[in-house]
Amino acid sequence: MGTAAAASISNHFLKRKDSVSLVTYGDKLDFLPADTGDKQHYKILSRLASVAAGGSMPLQAVTNSLAPRISRGSPVFIISSLEGDGTTLPAIRNLSGNGHEVIVLSPSSIDLERLVSRIPRMSYEVLKLERQNRLTAVSGYGAKVIDWMPEVELSQALLGSRGT
């Protein structure tokens, strides 16, 4: 879900002739500097094709190391379920505080899991409430949060977020 979203979002901005960079991380950081055009689109797709889920690098370590490379005021898209990383809130607060428009696209792993297996209703409700609390906290730090349900197409999730 996340790699397809990153490809779609980067393609949108490249078609507008905007510069786009890509950062992926897990156990290590992979940074593709900002550029424009078809060649950049190919580079982004190549990098995304080799991305694997997992790793233990905290988001704040990533944002701290990249802060000097991000132009002030540039929009920053974060695609993350927001689970298991206690540094997410400080990282988003720092990005927002440095003048960046932070957009968090958060695929709901809870709803995805519910689609493929049977989670007891009470467990699902508790996990859903915890997720909503995380999204609200992230929003409170200045980020625009898009709660992306697995049964909803990306374009619809993005369009639905315009009014919020």
Q: What do the predicted segments below correspond to?
A:
Residues 1-164:
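Exposed, interaction-prone extracellular/peripheral surfaces
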